[in-house]
Swiss-Prot record:
Bilayer topology: Multi-pass membrane protein
Residues of the Thioredoxin domain: 440-583
GO biological process: cell redox homeostasis; cytochrome complex assembly
The name this protein goes by in its record: Thiol:disulfide interchange protein DsbD
Reaction equations catalysed: [protein]-dithiol + NAD(+) = [protein]-disulfide + NADH + H(+); [protein]-dithiol + NADP(+) = [protein]-disulfide + NADPH + H(+)
Tagged with keyword Flavoprotein: no
Cysteine disulfide partners in this protein: C123-C128, C200-C322, C500-C503
Keywords for this protein: Cell inner membrane, Cell membrane, Cytochrome c-type biogenesis, Disulfide bond, Electron transport, Membrane, NAD, Oxidoreductase, Redox-active center, Signal, Transmembrane, Transmembrane helix, Transport
UniProt subcellular location: Cell inner membrane
GO cellular component annotations of the record: plasma membrane
Purpose: Required to facilitate the formation of correct disulfide bonds in some periplasmic proteins and for the assembly of the periplasmic c-type cytochromes. Acts by transferring electrons from cytoplasmic thioredoxin to the periplasm. This transfer involves a cascade of disulfide bond formation and reduction steps.
InterPro entries: Cyt_c_assmbl_TM_dom, DsbD_gamma, DsbDN, DsbDN_sf, Thiol_diS_interchange_DbsD, Thioredoxin-like_fold, Thioredoxin-like_sf, Thioredoxin_CS
Length: 583
């Protein structure tokens, strides 16, 4: 039983790691500018219009880039809501908006054909969008003057080959998100089954089964199934209501839950919860609360559907030391999602998973129950490691991107090391499992080994130029001339802008790498400065269907773009080198 559960936990951990982009080189999928920052303008009165941005999760707008310029009108000073302070490695302390921004505009004077020119620009981790300029009339009608036209041209593009790394169509992206959400939701069901095999719950299942059935003669199998199912549904109702309440409360605070202080606090809280799973201390309801709930439960009579249902509801409130930490973590996850459907369904599946063993024991008796022992404590400890994945995921959202693989690597090494220590050395199968775990440990240590290797070669790398020597091009016509003149060599075109954080990361961490520079020496390396978002820049973006920056294009020896090799978003040096080697 322990081995099966360990394999389940390893699967969960690998899924979390893959979702967080642990060691993979897959290109991330980015939304279009119109999807990431859905803009609308709504007239509120003859003298006021309301600008609204619905900002996708994980994306943000820079406050300093939001500018409103009146045409044939005068407006009162802009009244921004409180912004989030954000530390950027390259731009220092900046103010940003996440999730939603509403900006009321009040006119103090206006003439005929009055309008507003609204300028804004935003980013997400590893990717930035060109500045947007929208013209808004007083009746709320709007016309996009700049970069959003690129997204529209993308949809109408007649390019001969699809872009492998371009974002998917909106309906495809939605379908993929729904599929991913369904998968993540069902992990709560597996988590519930796992919680039933903790040392605080498993030994109580036979007693609980007897209480559910009651003191009368054992009912037939069908009635026993219905009674146990009623108990589980009562417990599930309590958990579902908890999920709905927490999700509803979480909705107004989604902006706060994105700020670094809150994310750091949540990471510390999850670490404390994980420590409780390691047995350092216990988290439970106050004794007085538990005694009152237990007294209420004892007043109910077993064997009756209504009483059994109420008993299940009360049991859902009595959080044991083994289940309170994972339950708290699940509730915090639900609060951050702010989704009522997700919140209710996730906690329902958690309770349903916890109730499956109870139903089986009620039907088939204690003979199917695994024997208690030290393995129960190991299951609890394994849950502690799963809990530690949450702080890593939270901190990866605010730390520089090169720290994320190091954190996942450290967690994986500690987890695998613990698995090696608890698996006995006797037996051929167990020895084979240990060998596989040792190999897994070696793979998990790769980011740290790569870090040490790069530091060890830093003195030698210093002899190489710190900055890659790009040849600048200004327009599409000039680029085509360069491609014609570069016959016989591959060409790399880097689209760069001063406002692009990930472009600066490429410049600092990737293009300064010795191995990358040696590989690029085999090519012609060109660069376009997109900082001013000029008409020439816009022409390039439309021609190549570029969504945002950084974007790096590659051309073969004949000057034809290698569309399958386009890079969107930041890649570290080793990832980018692997990408170059596949050209």
């Amino acid at each position: 039983m322990l081995k099966r559960f360990i394999f389940l936990l390893v699967g969960i951990t690998l899924t979390l790691s893959a979702h967080a982009g642990l060691f993979g080189n897959d290109q991330p999928k980015y939304l279009s500018g119109a999807e990431a920052f859905a803009f609308s303008a709504t007239p509120k009165s003859d003298k006021q219009i309301e600008l609204n941005w619905q900002i996708a999760d994980g994306y943000y707008l820079y406050k300093k880039e939001i500018q409103v310029t009146p045409q044939n009108a005068e407006i009162q000073p802009l009244a921004f809501p409180a912004a989030e302070n954000y530390h950027d490695e390259f731009f220092g302390e900046v103010e940003i908006f996440r999730n939603q921004l509403t900006l009321p505009i009040t006119f103090s004077a206006e003439q005929a054909n009055a309008s507003l020119s609204v300028h804004y620009q935003g980013c997400t981790k590893g990717f930035c969008y060109p500045p947007e300029t929208v013209t808004v009339s007083l009746d709320g009608q709007q016309a996009v003057d700049s970069a959003q036209n690129v997204a529209k041209n993308r949809e109408n593009s007649t390019a001969s080959q699809p872009l492998a790394n371009a974002p998917k169509a909106e309906q495809d992206q939605l379908a993929e998100n729904l599929a991913n959400n369904r998968l993540s939701i069902f992990w709560f069901f597996l988590l519930g089954i796992g919680l039933a095999f903790t040392p605080c719950v498993l030994p109580m299942l036979p007693l609980l089964s007897a209480i559910v059935i009651g003191n009368k003669q054992r009912p037939n199998t069908f009635k026993a199934l219905l009674l146990s199912f009623a108990y589980v549904q009562g417990m599930a109702l309590t958990y579902t209501l908890l999920g709905l309440v927490v999700a509803a409360i979480g909705l107004p605070f989604q902006v706060a839950l994105q700020s670094p202080p809150v994310l750091i606090s949540l990471a510390i809280l999850f670490t404390i919860l994980a420590a409780s799973m390691f047995g350092l201390f216990e988290i439970r309801l106050p004794n007085s609360w538990q005694q009152k709930l237990n007294a209420m439960s004892q007043k109910q009579q077993g064997g009756a559907f209504g009483s059994v249902f109420v008993m299940g509801m009360i049991a859902g409130l009595v959080a044991s030391p083994c289940t309170s930490a994972p339950l708290s973590g699940a509730l915090l996850y639900v609060a951050q999602s702010g989704d009522l459907l997700t919140g209710g369904l996730a906690l329902y599946l958690l309770a349903l998973g916890m109730g499956i063993p109870l139903i089986l024991i009620t039907l088939f008796g204690n003979r199917i129950l695994p024997k208690s022992g030290d393995w129960l404590l190991k299951v609890k400890t394994a849950f502690g490691f799963v809990m530690l994945a949450l702080p890593v995921f939270l901190l990866s959202r605010i730390l520089p991107s090169h720290y994320e693989p190091l954190m996942w690597s450290a967690l994986a090494m500690v987890f695998v090391g613990w698995l090696i220590s608890v698996i006995p050395t006797q037996g051929v199968i167990k020895q084979a499992v240990r060998i596989v775990l040792f190999l897994t440990f070696a793979v998990a240590s790769y980011p740290w080994a790569n870090l040490v290797w790069n530091q060890g070669n830093s003195s030698h790398s210093a002899q190489v130029s710190n900055h890659l020597a790009f040849e600048r091009v200004q327009s599409l016509a000039e680029l085509q001339e360069k491609l014609t003149a570069s016959q016989g060599k591959k060409v790399m075109l880097d689209l760069y802008a001063d406002w692009c954080v990930a472009c600066k990361e490429f410049e600092k961490y990737t293009f300064t790498d010795q191995a990358v520079q040696q590989k690029l020496a085999e090519m012609v390396v060109l660069q376009v400065d997109m900082t001013n978002n000029s008409a020439q820049n816009d022409e390039l973006m439309k021609h190549f269907n570029v969504l945002g920056l950084p974007t790096i294009l590659f051309f073969d020896e004949s000057g034809k773009e290698l569309t399958q090799s386009r890079v969107t978003g930041f890649l570290e040096a080793n990832q980018f080198l692997n990408w170059l080697n596949q050209l």
